[in-house]
């Protein structure tokens, strides 16, 4: 019997491998290839902190447990290490052997210290002495307390030997004679990592800050010479949960979690050296295994090179600019109240601008007829205009209530700051729910329209974050549908006050009803499926890991239901297995925008339904988070969403298809086929719509009236 489920962690690694695949594409602009390499690194940072740490904890607590994909924690850790070592090796080989030389061809030449000419050596020597040396703090390691190494910060390690052993014995700063003389220097955050060199004839050359510290770091240790050195960083366990049963202040409890994250156990050492003495020293001190150590050649962190985007050369080495079009259904200058009273409006970022969401909140803050604003915030970014609008609304006397989810991983500190700032401005802030993360994205404005109090609702698959809205593909809906508005009211009452679970008529809410609704709709497809008219399920999401849902999809496949899945990241479902999943196809898209929308289509005989959601089909989303799934009821919007969904299954440029052996195979252009790149097709659709609208505007006659 073939495996029924792929392993979650190994499936995630395959997702990062698909990102790396794009970095190898020679047809992509150079800076975009470098960007994909950088994403591989940042993704691994989170993966090791959260997922690898989780498996390591399981190995300690329950070492013999076997997961549904057949792995014990120990065997899984071996597989993780082998796959990650392979990807990281390929990543850095591509960086140093292909991308760095290509940068040099584009007049952005990375230079090692050994390659500097005499003039440049004088420059870097003076630069180090004047601009770098004052920032550096050497940390000795022979004291009883090993120096604290900050999670994900980069360091230089020096293995030292006394120049004069007799003289060193008499020094009050000699340290423990028997201890290895290893010292650390943290690479300062306040300095640019790229140091430009003096050149002639307009040529641009640079060295990296860390290599200056490697070269001149001896100056930090008078009386010693450097035998060996290397650059390194560590990743620590970051998968902490707050004590939600604590009687103390919840913000204080969250701050304790942030402190713990900086001193937890180490799960990875990434370094640039084969210096066995330093590696062995760190291995012992950090209590790690050989499988946890990743040694790379050349530049440790490709992300430092992304600053090259800001150069004149770098600006010409990226994707051609794609405009974010203002939706033609919404007026740029006037408030949206009149439009939304008559129709639902779909917003598709980043092809369409995120400005309407900001304008919607800003208009509500300033409108004298608006009585109240309620919304959820999960990740909203820095310098958010949404926060400014909410504060202004409170200052204008509106009742403003915001649920800020403090437990949004790696955004806890920022969200604590927003919560405090909003409270200081007079906003009522709710800090989420006990033992549940609120991941739903919903905004409701209550306004007095003539003699009627009307509720304007915005629901989204993505966060209220203007910055990521330029990079993540998400769908959202503006509506005044009465059933949805009534459900929105009940939702806010449940998450901000005390309430029994309320039955919702149009919305589905996790952990209450999304899972059961999905299972019911899958079963409905099975019940209505015939040989003449087989059922059809089409779904797009970030990850698919919920075993109950996967089993239901297997059952649907066996009943003849056709299942098309677009899964960007983790997929534990095994497709294409006869007698289990032969009617299931799984594809994944990795392109310039991160695919983030969740779209679920059920054919339902001749009465098809489409839902959008904040939730993926994962246990955490369906059982441990507060999520919302909302129907598309407007016929025009329904048609639009279905056309968007269909495009993702036409892609033959940036798609991979999952096979039953777990391999993701690139979907290639076949002979006679036209090129179909889903994101480009969507961009061109919105551009045509915008261009057509602009032409219509130009043809309209505007009568100039006499000003009295």
Regions found by a protein language model. Give the residues of each.
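Glycine/threonine-rich ATP-lid/beta-loop region of ATP-binding domains
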Residues: 547-550, 554
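N-terminal localization/anchoring segments of enzymes in phospholipid and broader phosphate metabolism
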Residues: 1-537, 555, 559, 571-708
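Hydrophobic alpha/beta core scaffold segments
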Residues: 562-566
């Amino acid at each position: 019997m073939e495996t029924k489920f792929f392993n979650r962690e190994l499936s995630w690694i395959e997702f990062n491998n698909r990102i790396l695949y794009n970095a190898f594409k020679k047809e992509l602009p150079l800076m975009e290839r470098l960007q994909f390499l950088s994403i591989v690194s940042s993704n691994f940072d989170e993966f090791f902190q959260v997922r690898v740490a989780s498996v390591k904890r399981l190995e300690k607590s329950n070492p013999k447990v076997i997961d549904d994909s057949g792995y014990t924690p120990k065997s899984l850790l071996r597989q993780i290490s082998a796959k990650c070592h392979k990807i990281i090796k390929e990543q850095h080989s591509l960086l140093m052997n292909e991308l760095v030389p290509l940068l040099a061809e584009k007049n952005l030449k990375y230079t090692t210290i050994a390659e500097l000419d005499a003039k440049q050596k004088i420059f870097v020597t003076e630069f180090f002495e004047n601009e770098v040396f004052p920032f550096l703090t050497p940390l000795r390691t022979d004291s009883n307390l090993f120096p604290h190494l900050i999670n994900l910060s980069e360091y230089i390690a020096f293995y030292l030997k006394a120049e004069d052993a007799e003289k060193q014995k008499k020094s009050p700063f000699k340290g423990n004679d028997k201890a290895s003389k290893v010292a650390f220097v943290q690479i300062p955050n306040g300095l640019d990592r790229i140091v430009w060199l003096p050149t002639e004839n307009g040529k641009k050359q640079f060295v990296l800050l860390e290599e200056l510290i490697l070269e001149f770091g001896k100056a930090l240790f008078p009386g010693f010479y450097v035998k060996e050195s290397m650059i390194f960083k560590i990743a620590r366990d970051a998968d902490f949960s707050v004590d939600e049963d604590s009687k103390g202040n919840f913000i204080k409890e969250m701050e304790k979690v942030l402190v713990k994250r900086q001193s937890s156990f180490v799960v990875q050492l990434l370094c640039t050296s084969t210096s066995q003495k330093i590696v062995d020293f760190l291995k012992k001190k950090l209590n790690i295994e050989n499988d946890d150590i990743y040694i790379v050649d050349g530049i440790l962190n490709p992300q430092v090179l992304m600053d090259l985007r800001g150069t004149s050369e770098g600006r010409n080495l990226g994707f051609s600019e794609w405009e974010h079009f203002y939706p033609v259904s919404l007026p740029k200058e006037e408030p949206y109240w009149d439009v939304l009273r008559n129709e639902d409006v779909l917003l598709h970022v980043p092809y369409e601008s995120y400005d309407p969401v900001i304008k919607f909140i800003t208009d509500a803050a300033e409108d004298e007829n608006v009585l109240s604003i309620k919304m959820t915030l999960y990740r909203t970014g820095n310098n958010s205009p949404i926060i400014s609008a909410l504060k202004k609304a409170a200052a204008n006397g509106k009742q403003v209530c915001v649920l800020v989810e403090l437990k949004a991983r790696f955004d806890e500190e920022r969200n604590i700051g927003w919560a405090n700032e909003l409270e200081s401005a007079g906003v009522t802030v709710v800090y989420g729910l006990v033992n549940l993360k609120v991941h739903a994205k919903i905004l409701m404005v209550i306004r007095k329209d003539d003699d009627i109090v009307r509720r304007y609702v915005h629901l989204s698959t993505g966060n209220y974050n203007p910055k990521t809205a330029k990079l993540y593909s998400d769908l959202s809906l503006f509506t005044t549908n009465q059933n949805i508005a009534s459900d929105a009211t009940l939702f806010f009452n449940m998450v901000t006050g005390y309430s029994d679970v309320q039955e919702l008529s149009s919305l589905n809410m996790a952990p209450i009803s999304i899972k059961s609704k999905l299972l019911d709709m899958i079963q409905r497809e099975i019940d209505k499926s015939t040989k003449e008219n087989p059922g059809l399920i089409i779904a797009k999401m970030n990850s698919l890991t919920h075993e109950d849902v996967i089993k239901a999809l297997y059952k649907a496949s066996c009943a003849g239901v056709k299942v098309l899945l677009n899964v960007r990241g983790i997929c534990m479902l095994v497709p294409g297995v006869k007698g289990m999943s032969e009617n299931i196809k799984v594809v994944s898209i990795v392109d310039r925008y991160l695919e983030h929308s969740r779209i679920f289509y059920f054919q339902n005989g001749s009465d098809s339904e489409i839902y959008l959601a904040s939730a993926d089909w994962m246990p955490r989303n369906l059982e441990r988070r507060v999520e919302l799934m909302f129907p598309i009821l407007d016929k025009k919007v329904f048609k639009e969403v279905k056309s968007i969904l269909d495009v993702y299954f036409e892609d033959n440029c940036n798609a991979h298809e999952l096979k039953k052996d777990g391999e993701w195979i690139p979907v290639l252009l076949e002979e006679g086929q036209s090129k179909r790149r889903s994101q480009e097709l969507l961009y061109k659709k919105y551009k045509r719509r915008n261009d057509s609208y602009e032409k219509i505007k130009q043809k309209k006659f505007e009568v100039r009236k006499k000003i009295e």
